[in-house]
Amino acid sequence: MAKILVLYYSMYGHIETLAGAIAEGARKVSGVDVTIKRVPETMPAEAFAKAGGKTNQQAPVATPHELADYDGIIFGTPTRFGNMSGQMRTFLDQTGGLWASGALYGKVASVFASTGTGGGQEHTITSTWTTLAHHGFIIVPIGYGAKELFDVSQTRGGTPYGATTIAGGDGSRQPSAEELAIARFQGEHVAKITAKLKG
């Protein structure tokens, strides 16, 4: 059975919501076991609470060494100035031992993201790919396989690189039905490829 990890960081819950949709899509594929985990928070608790961070996230916290236990990993991160969040960066910076041993080489990876106003969402995904390439992950974008990517009638996230959501400058906009559909597509797409490669 192929094992897939949906690994995310979410401060306000947008990426957490997308992670749930990604996992839902992946679970449509038979022969796949899906786990959702999050990376540790690095902000001091007081600063996190003052910033309005979501403290009741149910996903357990992952440790870097356990990444080797999975056949495919779908990473989710909010955009911070066109890059992944510091929390995800800190987590991935602890995977040097996995890199040295080649523990992640040949595993499947994909990325999803959120932005406040849309700026940097594609760059966040593609810049995250750089770290994944150094590990030797097989990087899986979604292309234009999700029909929702052709809908230009409304503001929405979603790119050929991976699912995204636009949270709005104040974070009040939640993922739309179209954005969640794209996320489910990504989960299912990555799960199918992972299962095929696992054999």
Curated annotation (Swiss-Prot):
Residue numbers binding NAD(+): 12
Binding site for substrate: 99
EC number: 1.6.5.2
Binding annotation for FMN: 10-15, 79-81, 114-119, 134
Cofactor or coenzyme needed: FMN
InterPro entries in the cross-refs: Flavodoxin/NO_synth (IPR008254), Flavoprotein-like_sf (IPR029039), Flavoprotein_WrbA-like (IPR010089), FMN_Rdtase-like_dom (IPR005025), NQO (IPR037513)
Catalytic activities: a quinone + NADH + H(+) = a quinol + NAD(+); a quinone + NADPH + H(+) = a quinol + NADP(+)
Keyword check for rRNA-binding: no
Domain of life: Bacteria
Alphabetized Pfam families for the sequence: FMN_red
GO cellular-component term (any): membrane
PANTHER family xref list: FLAVODOXIN-RELATED PROTEIN WRBA-RELATED, FLAVOPROTEIN-LIKE PROTEIN YCP4-RELATED
Name this polypeptide is given: NAD(P)H dehydrogenase (quinone)
Organism: Yersinia pseudotuberculosis serotype I (strain IP32953)
